């Protein structure tokens, strides 16, 4: 009888010990020193009808300690205009979080956008990481730029794309003002990218396909990208990205919209993930390659990398 009566007490003590064990304490795997700020690409958004642009990524980062802010800038405009819009939000985030700096992560056109902020206000930026960003331009943008400037074809196409940008802005939680698809095109083609790089060279490789400076003006630079336009036959976006990949010349490795060498910035973590341009943000709806690590895991690993670098 005595032995039986002591069993509940023993269980209670055991459970209390387990609760105190570090094995089940909240993980800090993604708990960076500074907040993580996500910046979307061309025709991007923060959230539409409950669907995140960064599909499942913010919640996965927050789960293990990261402080994450999702921004929204103009869906279509130049890198400088988008950069100024992002800078305003970064200043608000710094004030709100109480931290003096942030870690920027930009996808696609978000890459040049975060570079602008890091270049003009390095005091606010701990790191700048680009994902599938066309730092030296995109062959797809070069292909579209062959449409004669000022032509009826250009006017019709830019009008349609601007309307799409306006619709995305309307449906999302942000209000990003007017759309400027021609500004985006000028920023993302090879000539426009070269002009931007001349003004803001931080982290850009000096060789055709090498790495850039890892740290400039106190800002750490990183990048990664995919190299497989077709990754999941169930993903409806693969057809579009497979077609757009045909605009790349001489068998250039690409993710459907951005060449792998063009994606290089600072420390190149990897440029050959089995991912296409939308897989890089876990779209569409997480339909990515079954033969590659989850994009969400890549972001979590990078947050841990930043944490270990005291960023």
Swiss-Prot record:
<dbReference type="GO" id="GO:0005576">
    <property type="term" value="C:extracellular region"/>
</dbReference>
<dbReference type="GO" id="GO:0016042">
    <property type="term" value="P:lipid catabolic process"/>
</dbReference>
<dbReference type="GO" id="GO:0004806">
    <property type="term" value="F:triacylglycerol lipase activity"/>
</dbReference>
<feature type="binding site">
    <location>
        <position position="235"/>
    </location>
    <ligand>
        <name>Ca(2+)</name>
    </ligand>
</feature>
<dbReference type="GO" id="GO:0046872">
    <property type="term" value="F:metal ion binding"/>
</dbReference>
<feature type="binding site">
    <location>
        <position position="279"/>
    </location>
    <ligand>
        <name>Ca(2+)</name>
    </ligand>
</feature>
<feature type="active site" description="Charge relay system">
    <location>
        <position position="277"/>
    </location>
</feature>
<keyword id="KW-0443">Lipid metabolism</keyword>
<feature type="binding site">
    <location>
        <position position="42"/>
    </location>
    <ligand>
        <name>substrate</name>
    </ligand>
</feature>
<feature type="domain" description="AB hydrolase-1">
    <location>
        <begin position="35"/>
        <end position="280"/>
    </location>
</feature>
<keyword id="KW-0106">Calcium</keyword>
<dbReference type="Pfam" id="PF00561">
    <property type="entry name" value="Abhydrolase_1"/>
</dbReference>
<feature type="signal peptide">
    <location>
        <begin position="1"/>
        <end position="26"/>
    </location>
</feature>
<comment type="similarity">
    <text>Belongs to the AB hydrolase superfamily. Pseudomonas lipase family.</text>
</comment>
<keyword id="KW-1015">Disulfide bond</keyword>
<keyword id="KW-0378">Hydrolase</keyword>
<keyword id="KW-0964">Secreted</keyword>
<feature type="binding site">
    <location>
        <position position="283"/>
    </location>
    <ligand>
        <name>Ca(2+)</name>
    </ligand>
</feature>
<feature type="binding site">
    <location>
        <position position="287"/>
    </location>
    <ligand>
        <name>Ca(2+)</name>
    </ligand>
</feature>
<feature type="active site" description="Charge relay system">
    <location>
        <position position="255"/>
    </location>
</feature>
<dbReference type="GO" id="GO:0015628">
    <property type="term" value="P:protein secretion by the type II secretion system"/>
</dbReference>
<dbReference type="GO" id="GO:0043952">
    <property type="term" value="P:protein transport by the Sec complex"/>
</dbReference>
<dbReference type="InterPro" id="IPR000073">
    <property type="entry name" value="AB_hydrolase_1"/>
</dbReference>
<feature type="disulfide bond">
    <location>
        <begin position="209"/>
        <end position="261"/>
    </location>
</feature>
<feature type="active site" description="Nucleophile">
    <location>
        <position position="108"/>
    </location>
</feature>
<keyword id="KW-0479">Metal-binding</keyword>
<comment type="function">
    <text>Catalyzes the hydrolysis of triacylglycerol. It also exhibits some esterase activity with p-nitrophenyl acetate and Tween 80 as substrates, however the lipase activity is approximately eight times the esterase activity. It shows a marked specificity for the 1,3-oleyl residues of triolein.</text>
</comment>
<feature type="binding site">
    <location>
        <position position="109"/>
    </location>
    <ligand>
        <name>substrate</name>
    </ligand>
</feature>
<dbReference type="GO" id="GO:0016298">
    <property type="term" value="F:lipase activity"/>
</dbReference>
<keyword id="KW-0732">Signal</keyword>
<protein>
    <recommendedName>
        <fullName>Triacylglycerol lipase</fullName>
        <ecNumber>3.1.1.3</ecNumber>
    </recommendedName>
</protein>
<dbReference type="InterPro" id="IPR029058">
    <property type="entry name" value="AB_hydrolase_fold"/>
</dbReference>
<keyword id="KW-0442">Lipid degradation</keyword>
<comment type="subunit">
    <text>Monomer.</text>
</comment>
């Amino acid at each position: 009888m005595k032995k039986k009566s002591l069993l509940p007490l023993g269980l209670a003590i055991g459970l209390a010990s387990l609760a105190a064990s570090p094995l089940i304490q909240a993980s800090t795997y993604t708990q960076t020193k500074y907040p993580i700020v996500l910046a979307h690409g061309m025709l991007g958004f923060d959230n539409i009808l409950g669907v995140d642009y960064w599909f499942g990524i913010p919640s996965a980062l927050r789960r293990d300690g990261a402080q994450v802010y999702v921004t929204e800038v103009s869906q279509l405009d130049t890198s400088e205009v988008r950069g100024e819009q992002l800078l305003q939000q970064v200043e608000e985030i710094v004030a709100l979080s109480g931290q003096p700096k942030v870690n920027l992560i930009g996808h696609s056109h978000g890459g040049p956008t975060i570079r602008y902020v890091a270049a003009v206000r390095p005091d606010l930026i701990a790191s700048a990481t680009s994902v599938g960003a066309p730092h030296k331009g995109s062959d797809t943008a070069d292909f579209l730029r062959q449409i004669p400037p000022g032509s009826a074809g250009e006017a019709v196409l830019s009008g349609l794309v601007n309307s799409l940008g306006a619709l995305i802005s309307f449906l999302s939680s942000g209000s990003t003002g007017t759309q400027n698809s021609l500004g985006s095109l000028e920023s993302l083609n090879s000539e426009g990218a070269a002009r931007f790089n001349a003004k803001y060279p931080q982290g850009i490789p000096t060789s055709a396909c090498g790495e850039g400076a890892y740290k400039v003006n106190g800002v750490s630079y990183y990048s990664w990208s995919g190299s497989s336009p077709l990754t999941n036959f169930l993903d409806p976006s693969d057809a579009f990205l497979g077609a757009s990949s045909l605009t790349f010349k001489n068998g250039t490795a690409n993710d459907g919209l951005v060449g792998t060498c063009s994606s290089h910035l600072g420390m190149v973590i990897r440029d050959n993930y089995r991912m296409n341009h939308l897989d890089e943000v876990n779209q569409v709806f997480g339909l990515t390659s079954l033969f590659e690590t989850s994009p969400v895991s890549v972001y979590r690993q990078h947050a841990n990398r930043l944490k270990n670098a005291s960023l």
